[in-house]
Structures are given as structure tokens and as C-alpha cells.
Amino acid sequence: MTWRERAEKLLIGISGMPGVGKTTLVLRVLELARSKYRCCGFVTVEVRERGVRIGFDTIDVVSGARVPLARVGTGSPSVGKYVVNLPSCEVISRALRQEDCEVAFIDEIGAMEFKCPTFYTDLRVAVDRIPRIIATVHRNYIHTAEKLGFEIIWLTRENWNSTLSTVLKALSLST
């Protein structure tokens, strides 16, 4: 049974290749959802210095708290050339455990987030407790998200607008 067939739980995962607009889509949906729902969660944004990506920050969508998630460097835990800042995991954990949340935004379900010791547990708690979740899912974690009940939409530049419409319709929002 998909989220299209059940009203009580909405778990949408947006996946796709880098640069197709997954985070942009989630931010647009969040902007519109705030007028109707109590939202929670986190988004991950690139940090650039002189046009070069040097890392990622995590932003709690409720408080606006912004913390470094990862930076280029050496050390552990790491994902590729990025070292994950474990204290940022607390912001992610709090964002997923927010009380009275009607729609959670998770950007993203991916390797850096899984370096956080409690991420999978926090994610499972959110899936059990929050009625609607919109998440970006790294392509290597699609199977993990599907096991949690997410229906995956593969985003491309060509289907960006129709995917936005699909997600907004699922949330009973209009553009």
C-alpha cells in the first residue's frame, strides 16, 4: 500500500542525482506547508568559500539553529573528503524528536547523517510518530528508506515541477 492509498501516513522520499534540486524542492514545500501545518525537521545546505564547496551546515526548521554538519578535512568520522561534526547530530536528533509535529522535513537520509550515532533510531521514532514526512534520500540509501515505508520519487530536472505538484497535492497544498 502506498501513501497515495492511505490517509493516515505520508512518507515521501525524494531521490535523484546530485544537482537536480532535491533540497530546493523540499525548501519550497516547507515554505508552503508552514501556513497549514506545524513543521519540524532539518535541512542541509552547502557551505561555499570563494565558489568552492567546503562543507555542509544543518538547519533546524523550527528554531533556525544552524550548525556545521561537515567540513573538508582529515579525521573521523568522515564521508569522502568531509569530516562529520558529531555535535551537529544533537540538532538533527532534536529536530526529529520535536513534539506536536504534523509534517517533518528531513534533508537528507544519507551517509553523513548516518554517522550520527542515534540517527537511525531517531528516524524510526519520527516515522512511527509523525504523520507526514518529506525527505530527501541519497540514492545509495533508497533501500533503507523503502524499508522504513517511504515511497521514493526519482527527481530529475525534467520532472521537477510535476514532482513539486505531486508532493503539494499529497499535503493538500496548492501553488
Curated annotation (Swiss-Prot):
Gene3D superfamilies given in the database record: P-loop containing nucleotide triphosphate hydrolases
Pfam family of this protein, just one? NTPase_1
Q: EC annotation?
A: 3.6.1.15
Q: What class of enzyme is it?
A: hydrolase
Q: Know the name of this protein?
A: Nucleoside-triphosphatase THEP1
Q: Which residues bind ATP?
A: 16-23, 103-110
Q: Which family does it belong to?
A: Belongs to the THEP1 NTPase family.
